[in-house]
UniProtKB/Swiss-Prot annotation:
It comes from Protochlamydia amoebophila (strain UWE25). Its EC number is 2.5.1.75. This is tRNA dimethylallyltransferase. ATP binds at G43, P44, T45, C46, C47, G48, K49, S50. GO terms for molecular function: ATP binding; tRNA dimethylallyltransferase activity. Belongs to the IPP transferase family. It catalyses: adenosine(37) in tRNA + dimethylallyl diphosphate = N(6)-dimethylallyladenosine(37) in tRNA + diphosphate. One of its GO terms (biological process) is tRNA modification. The lineage of its organism: Bacteria, Pseudomonadati, Chlamydiota, Chlamydiia, Parachlamydiales. Residues 68-71 are annotated as: Interaction with substrate tRNA.
Length: 344
């Protein structure tokens, strides 16, 4: 197990201390001794977050909280690279398989359920380890949920009907005109966020970019020890392509067909998830060999684009220390995070 590795070099200690001091200067209150520590492992898809979180949890009596917006859904297993049942036997996992595919789950749900899980784990004397790549969800966990108004079903339904009738690109263009700053943070295919943004602006007469996180740039309650794992783009993209191929070999299309029979298309969030959206579109075609190859191409391309957006998002997150996992051995990465956690 990597956790038995000991790396007591002065260089590792120096790097860890330097990382900690950088964050402490920006957020001195985050390092108050009376605050309980929580490890956060983020990064783009295919960078090794899950393996590292498992290793840390096995070593330090940790429990893992998923920060993946789709792993909450039962049945979305292969396409979300969900922890296996065997892995969940060794280490307790939270916020996995907690919703049926027909149910909704949003950032506010995540905030309250993740905070509840953190406190429960701490009360048991264990270490919460949050792992995932959803920047929006992690931002909410660190600073508090978005301050937008509660959803109004009638208003939301009108926008959902309109986006189905006109297409997401038309409503995305409308959003870009009303709030170009927020529009740049999402894609034209993200129907759920487009609809929610338009709903918020109709209800508040304010731009989402001016509303969502105003006045909440201070970490809440806990001492979050945040890390962003990354690799050089070329190597990351190569790993992404291989993972997509592996998912298909493991039966991803059968998984999507089953979810389709359960009504995934009625879930505007789950049906737009990377891989699932492309697979559902393919299932509506004649499913020829050339159309299948086009599906694979779009699946890989969408995953690479998502990884790029993850880099963009986390560059704006001051609490996260970046670690090039291609530059450092896994043992060194593990030891750095462990020593940082032990640093008071």
């Amino acid at each position: 197990m990597i956790g038995n590795f000991s790396c007591e070099t002065d260089e590792i200690k120096r790097i860890v201390l330097n990382f900690a001091l950088q964050v402490q200067k920006k957020f001195p209150s985050n390092f108050q001794k009376n605050k309980k520590r929580i490890i956060v492992i983020a990064g783009p898809t295919c960078c090794g977050k899950s393996a590292l979180a498992l290793n840390l949890a096995q070593t330090m009596d940790g429990e893992i909280i998923s920060a993946d917006s789709m792993q909450v859904y039962r049945g979305m297993d292969i396409g979300t690279a969900k922890a296996t049942k065997e892995e969940r036997l060794f280490v307790p996992h939270h916020l996995i398989d907690i919703r049926d595919i027909q149910e909704s789950f949003n950032v506010v749900d995540f905030y309250y359920e993740a905070r509840q899980a953190c406190q429960k784990i701490l009360d048991q004397g264990n270490v919460p380890i949050i792992a995932g790549g959803s920047g929006f969800y992690l931002h909410a966990l660190l600073y508090g949920p978005p301050s937008g108004p509660p959803s109004v079903p009638e208003v939301r339904k009108s926008f959902e009907d309109e986006i189905e009738r006109l297409g997401s690109e038309i409503l995305y263009e409308r959003l870009s005109q009303l709030d170009p700053q927020y529009a740049k943070t999402i894609t034209k295919n993200d129907k759920q966020k487009i609809v929610r943004a338009l709903e918020i602006m109709m209800l508040t007469n304010k731009k989402v970019s001016k509303l969502s996180w105003k006045g909440r740039r201070k970490p809440q309650n806990y001492d979050f020890r945040c890390w962003f794992l990354h690799r050089p783009k070329e190597k990351l993209y190569e790993r992404i392509d291989k993972r997509c191929d592996k998912m298909l070999e493991e039966g991803f299309m059968d998984e999507v067909r089953h979810l389709d029979s359960l009504g995934i298309r009625g879930n505007s969030s789950a049906s737009q998830a990377i891989g699932y959206r492309q697979a559902l579109n393919f299932l509506k075609t004649e499913q020829t060999a050339s159309q299948y190859q086009e599906f694979i191409r779009s699946f890989k391309q969408a995953t690479r684009h998502y990884a790029k957006r993850q880099f963009t998002w986390f560059r704006k997150e001051p609490l996260f220390r970046w670690l090039d996992v291609d530059m450092h051995d896994p043992e060194v990465v593990f030891d750095m995070i462990l020593k940082d956690y032990e640093l008071l």
